[in-house]
Amino acid sequence: MSNGFIVQIIGAVVDIEFPQDAVPQVYDAVKVVSEGQGQGLVLEVQQQIGGGVVRCITMGSSDGLRRGLEVMNSGKSIQVPVGVSTLGRIMNVLGEPIDEKGPIGEEERWSIHRAAPSYEDQSNSNDLLETGIKVIDLVCPFAKGGKVGLFGGAGVGKTVNMMELIRNIAIEHSGYSVFAGVGERTREGNDFYHEMMESNVLDKVSLVYGQMNEPPGNRLRVALTGLTMAEKFRDEGRDVLFFVDNIYRYTLAGTEVSALLGRMPSAVGYQPTLAEEMGVLQERITSTRTGSITSVQAVYVPADDLTDPSPATTFAHLDATVVLSRQIAALGIYPAVDPLDSTSRQLDPLVVGKEHYETARGVQTVLQRYKELKDIIAILGMDELSEEDKLTVARARKIERFLSQPFFVAEVFTGSPGKYVPLKETIRGFQGILKGEYDDLPEQAFYMVGSIDEVVEKSKKL
């Protein structure tokens, strides 16, 4: 392979000139070989712009780069370690260990750019994945091998919800998981690592981090690195869980480099290739006949606007959407899941059964009626309502509070022990409220408890 030389540097985007007969292909990895600062830096080819020049994105800081530095073409795309040796380790976008525990010791490396499984190879299942979180299991149940989005603005609990899901599923489900931290806070990555360690599930999780302080190249590719590791577990015939926090930062990293790559911005300043970039990632997150990938993705919603192009593009790919609401968080109800806005393809009587379906729809009907009555209550007060509506409001307020739940990962700051509620218990509790079996209990008893039996116990102490 002939070497090339850097001819232009604009932030994270670098132009490199190669001999005309040895131009690297798009997505090839190239490496700075000149001695000094910047040596060993890996770049990924994005465009061939003619005259032997290729435009690349750096997979690290471009500090210390200068024109004229020599660059070697590896002749292949970025390769990362896969397999059981990655479990319990923290790696960066290139699959290099960053946890100071020595080399990964992998037997195999895979390219991060891979084709999605063909239509014939794909399979879907209607098995439910129990999470132990009441509101999710009831209103927007997850499918095994499905895709779930956690939508929410800043500070409504996406990461805490995700950590609780990982903890519950890792302990109860005991499969392998891959966690990709895409452009999130390093502190959260650190908290997560220690949380997994304390729960004794670290040896079942591979962690890949490209956090907020990293250049856009890392944040753009780290989701693919994590996905490649998950695909390896799937192709070995396992059921693997793939967590991404946060998919919005993946889009944002693409936006940051898009203009530097010479593309015209589209709606709201996003890259024109937004739908394609999202599709390339999401189409690979799928289940095949050999194994399944169940993915949970946190999606930041800019300014709480669900019609923003980034969350709107993500919606199309998901089987279940868990929408976190600032209004519900303001009431002090956590998890702040909006039961009227959250959806799931699994909420179908043919999949979840008639009992579950009718309970979930009954809960939504009562909450929707309460929402409609709120304006009347605000203007005229409760006394103007009919007896039937008064009963609906009382039950709705109990349901709202019963949808809250203490989390294991939040024990430190709530002071109450976490609760895992089996689906049967969840359905039994909400059915009881809808039938009026608990009309005599005060609504405070329903707040921050697990099963309905705890409500009865709590009401005796009030």
Curated annotation (Swiss-Prot):
Produces ATP from ADP in the presence of a proton gradient across the membrane. The catalytic sites are hosted primarily by the beta subunits. This is ATP synthase subunit beta. It comes from Aeromonas salmonicida (strain A449). GO terms for cellular component: plasma membrane; proton-transporting ATP synthase complex. It is a peripheral membrane protein. It is found in: Cell inner membrane. PROSITE patterns: ATPASE_ALPHA_BETA. The gene is atpD. One of its GO terms (molecular function) is ATP binding. Belongs to the ATPase alpha/beta chains family. Its main location: membrane.
